[in-house]
Amino acid sequence: MEKKNILITGRKNVGKSILVKRVIEQFHGYAGFKTVPLKNYGLISTYQMYDFINKTSIPISKYVDNKIVGIPESFSTFGKKCLKNALDSNYSLVIMDELGRFERTSRDFLYYVNEVLNSDKIVIAVIKAEKIDYLEKIKNRKDCYLYDLDEVSFVKAYQEIIFRLNVLLTWEGDKID
C-alpha cells in the first residue's frame, strides 16, 4: 500500500498545529478544518471547528460543571459537511486539525474521517496524543506517515513533510510555491 497521508501527534503544546500551519502556508489551496480556541476558562478552553472551504465555524465543546465537554451534534452536522465538502472539492490536500476525544461518539463524522483517509486526497491530520480506539486505528494505518513531535524535532518533521508533499503533489499535478 502506497503511503500518502501524514499524521502528526505529540503531547499538548508541542507544536502540532503550528507545524501544520507552517506547512500549509506553502500551498495554493486546501480543504478540511482546524480546531481553534473559542473561550478560555482559566487553564482550559472551549473550542470551535473552522471550515477552510466555507470559512465558517461552529463550537465543538462547551464548559459544563467545571469541565470541557464535546458537542457531538457539531461533528454530526457541521463536521460531517466539512469533510464531505472536502471530498467533493477539487483540492488535492485535506487538513484535519485536530482529531481527538470530543468527536469519538459521532459515527457520522468518523465515517467521513475514514472516507477522506481512504480517498485519493492527501491528508494532513493532527492526532491528539491519547489512547482512544479510533485514534489508535488511524495511527496504525499502513497508508500514513506518522510524525510524533515528542520523538522527532519540529524542523526535521517540517522538512520531511514538505519533501513528501512535493513528491505526492507532483503526482497529483499540484505544486508548492
Predicted regions and their residues:
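Hydrophobic anchor at the beta1->P-loop junction of P-loop NTPases
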Residues: I8
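Phosphate-binding/switch loop-helix module in NTP-utilizing enzymes
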Residues: N66-E115
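Conserved lysine of the Walker
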Residues: K16
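Phosphate-binding P-loop
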Residues: M1-K3
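Conserved acidic residues
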Residues: Y30, S92-L93, K121, C144
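P-loop (Walker A) phosphate-binding loop of NTP-binding proteins
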Residues: R11
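N-terminal phosphate/diphosphate-binding loop that engages ATP/GTP or pyrophosphate donors
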Residues: K21-I68
